[in-house]
């Protein structure tokens, strides 16, 4: 089974867009002479571009996930996966790349995820708004 799904980080995008707007308002109130605001705007735009979405792919013999245009790409062999299950994260784990009590979490929005445990014992979670679809794709492709 081939699977590809991209989740947009809608709330994250809104928060970053509001932060960019705030920086521009501050710069405007300072007569557009606020280099710190410009630096912050550039940084926020880069973060928005890199972390605005999370794509997950299951194809052939691999599970892949990456943020935005291919940032922080991770690839795992399906034969290395021992178990996979649908989970719900605590809101406290947040978005982005986080170390949690359950291993690394890669997430852009929401609380739903699929937890993967490798034969090596390593565990990680991939946040998704399609946990059933991802779980089905992984489960059907594990040798």
Regions inferred by a protein language model and the residue ranges of each:
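Hydrophobic alpha-helical segments and helix-packing faces
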Residues: 36-37, 56, 74
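N-terminal membrane-targeting/pre-transmembrane regions
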Residues: 1-31, 105-106, 111-113, 123, ...
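Alpha-helical transmembrane segments of multipass membrane proteins
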Residues: 24, 45-46
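Non-transmembrane, membrane-adjacent beta-strand/coil modules in membrane-associated proteins
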Residues: 52, 66-129
